[in-house]
Regions:
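Intrinsically disordered, low-complexity linkers and terminal regions
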Residues: 1-136
């Protein structure tokens, strides 16, 4: 079965190396590193949550005036709020924890399948060499 995190964080093999895609809430970003893809996925999720809840993601934009030529003014984007930054960091940590747990579960399932295959094989061998008088 495919989990939601498998759909949100996909790995595509390419001739030049693996390509990671972060896909969530109708947004997509392709990255060359898994770390960057996790950060983008956290960004998509945090931005969506803040947008829906009405919390401010950024401080207001500020107009910066050039010190020598005042006609060359520009707008500087406001920095992210502390609440948004902390929420983003929490989301990254939670995503990493989910992925680590998933890897751990996959390793355990692999060991379980190997043990089960050995058991079935041994059982079939015992059934094949069973003496005729036994009813079991």
């Amino acid at each position: 079965t495919v989990s939601a995190i498998d759909l949100a964080l996909q790995k595509h093999p390419t001739p030049v190396g693996d390509l990671f895609a972060a896909i969530r809430h109708g947004r997509m970003k392709r990255c060359f590193s898994r770390d960057t893809a996790i950060r983008y996925l956290a960004f998509f999720m945090t931005s969506r949550a803040f947008g829906r809840s009405g919390f401010k993601q950024r401080f207001p934009d500020v107009q910066v005036i050039h010190p020598l030529n005042p006609e060359l003014s520009s707008w500087q984007r406001g920095a992210v709020t502390t609440e948004y930054f902390n929420a983003h960091q929490r989301t990254v940590r939670r995503l990493r924890r989910i992925l680590a747990r998933k890897r751990e579960m996959q390793k355990w399932c692999k060991k379980w399948d190997a043990m089960h295959d050995r058991y079935v094989k041994e059982r079939e061998e015992l059934q094949a060499c069973k003496p005729g008088g036994l009813s079991r």
